[in-house]
From Swiss-Prot:
Function per UniProt: Transcription factor. Binds to a sequence motif, 5'-TTATTGGCTTCGTTAA-3', which may be involved in AIY interneuron function, in the regulatory elements of target genes; binding is more efficient, in vitro, together with homeobox protein ceh-10. Required for specification of the AIA and AIY interneurons and the NSM neurons. Positively regulates the expression of a number of genes including ceh-10, ceh-23, kal-1, hen-1, ser-2, unc-17 and sra-11 in AIY neurons, and cat-4, flp-4, bas-1, ptps-1 and mgl-1 in NSM neurons.
DNA-binding region as annotated in the record: 292-351
Subcellular location(s) of the protein: Nucleus; Perikaryon; Cell projection, Axon
SMART domains reported for this sequence: HOX, LIM
GO terms (BP aspect): associative learning; axonogenesis; dauer larval development; negative adaptation of signaling pathway; neuron differentiation; olfactory learning; positive regulation of dauer larval development; positive regulation of DNA-templated transcription
Domain LIM zinc-binding: 108-169, 171-232
Protein name: LIM/homeobox protein ttx-3
Bias (Polar residues): 382-409
UniProt organism field: Caenorhabditis elegans
Keyword line: Cell projection, DNA-binding, Homeobox, LIM domain, Metal-binding, Nucleus, Repeat, Transcription, Transcription regulation, Zinc
MF (Gene Ontology): DNA-binding transcription activator activity, RNA polymerase II-specific; DNA-binding transcription factor activity, RNA polymerase II-specific; metal ion binding; RNA polymerase II cis-regulatory region sequence-specific DNA binding; RNA polymerase II transcription regulatory region sequence-specific DNA binding
Length: 409
């Protein structure tokens, strides 16, 4: 605000009392209520201080608006000039007012390494910025290409292959992750590829309407090989653990005639036909003179199971098969030959009798049948516990449909 001195012309003069009142009101308007300091007021004194002229021009309104803006917090980085207490107008006080500086826009930062991204090409996942080299699969540590999908789960970045290994269900037979477009067969809670739903022994494909069974290990067996699996499973459950030891011959009689001979050690009781003893002499001959030196073999569960399973496939194995079976069961080749010979004799005797003899190995439970369900049907329908159904899992399941929080580049 600028003030001008009055001229000598009496026509331009005004009343002194009125001018002082207007000047006081102006100073009160220009006083800052918070700091109580006069801001940007310039007064030029004259040799004749008795009379003043006040200019109500547009400059006053502009400067008044400027003072109002200066009181706002965003306009504080200005230098205010106020007159000193003395009458000398040349002595001015400069005061710097602190304000926040206007900074340029922050550069994009990588959310992993927190460094600025200055590359021409960046990766954006879920609205966050990353370096192309920083965005990697956390299992195989391979950076993502532009055509690859990036799966994000629990804050972990995974490629398609590692995500399938970690979260997708796999085929029970080939252990390959199941894709959404794959046709699958479901037996109880186990899922198979359509091509993997075959018999474990002969490899024949199981079709709708065929009879099959499933072992506790998840192996499928057709109706032709059901008997081998039936005897193997029940032998494992019903057989009693036997001591796989060779009974030593009785000790020689004492030399003295006065003392009574010691009692012979008790022989372990012979089991039923499930124990499958190999009654052979030590030298391979069945002569009665050496019957006292005959060694009797008792088989373990896994040995008996392996021999019965192989007997269901081949009743008369050759030398090569016996060698492999001996390495698997830890038995001698001679013991295996005798066991297969006795098993063949028993099998022919049962066929000659006109039917299988009643034994605790028979299974009274019916075989399970399987049905083919429509592609989108659920497997939770009520059916017998013995029935294994073949169907395709619903495509709307979370196993085969992509999750909502998965994001790709």
């Amino acid at each position: 605000m600028y003030f001008q001195s009055l001229s000598a012309d009496p026509l331009d003069s005004v009343n002194t009392t009125t001018d002082f009142n207007q000047l006081a009101q102006l100073l009160l308007m220009l006083t800052n209520s918070s700091s109580k300091e006069t801001i940007a007021t310039h007064v030029v004194t004259n040799s004749v201080p008795s009379a003043f002229q006040f200019d109500w021009s547009s400059h006053f309104k502009e400067e008044y608006d400027l003072v109002e803006k200066l009181n706002s917090p965003q306009y504080t980085n200005l230098t205010s000039i106020s007159p000193s207490s003395s009458t000398d107008s040349n002595n001015l006080i400069l005061r710097q007012i602190q304000i926040p500086k206007i900074e340029p826009a922050l550069l994009n930062q990588c959310c992993l390494c927190t460094f600025a991204i200055v590359d021409k090409e960046i990766s954006v996942v879920d609205g966050k910025y990353y370096h192309n080299n920083c965005l990697r699969c956390q299992m195989c540590d391979i950076p993502f290409e532009y055509s690859d999908k990036c799966y994000v789960r629990d804050g972990v970045f995974l490629c398609r292959a590692d995500h399938a290994k970690r979260y997708q269900k796999c085929c029970r037979k080939c252990e390959i992750p199941l894709n959404r477009e794959d046709m699958v067969m479901k037996a109880k809670e186990m899922i198979f590829h359509h091509a993997c739903f075959v018999c474990f022994i002969c490899g024949i494909k199981l079709n709708p309407g065929d009879y099959y069974t499933m072992s506790p290990q998840g192996h499928l067996y057709c109706h032709a090989h059901y008997n081998a699996v039936r005897s193997t499973v029940l032998c494992e459950e019903a057989a009693v653990a036997t001591v796989p030891a060779v009974v030593a011959p009785p000790p020689p009689p004492p030399t003295t005639t006065t003392a009574p001979p010691p009692a012979a050690p008790e022989q372990p009781p012979r089991e039923a036909s499930t124990e499958a003893e190999a009654s052979t002499d030590e030298d391979g001959n069945g002569s009665g003179s050496q019957r006292s030196k005959r060694m009797r073999t008792s088989f373990k569960h896994h040995q008996l199971r392996a021999m019965k399973t192989y007997f269901a496939l081949n009743h008369n194995p050759d030398a090569k098969d016996l060698k492999q079976l001996a390495a698997k069961t830890n038995l001698t080749k001679r013991v295996l030959q005798v066991w297969f010979q006795n098993a063949r004799a028993k099998y022919r005797r049962e066929l000659h009798d006109g039917g299988r003899s009643s034994s605790p190995l028979c299974v009274s439970a019916p075989l399970a049948s399987m049905d083919m369900n429509p592609p989108l049907s659920s497997s939770s329908s009520g059916h017998s516990t013995d029935g294994y159904q073949l169907n395709t899992p619903p495509l709307s399941s979370e196993i085969y449909s992509p999750n909502s929080n998965y994001t790709h580049l």
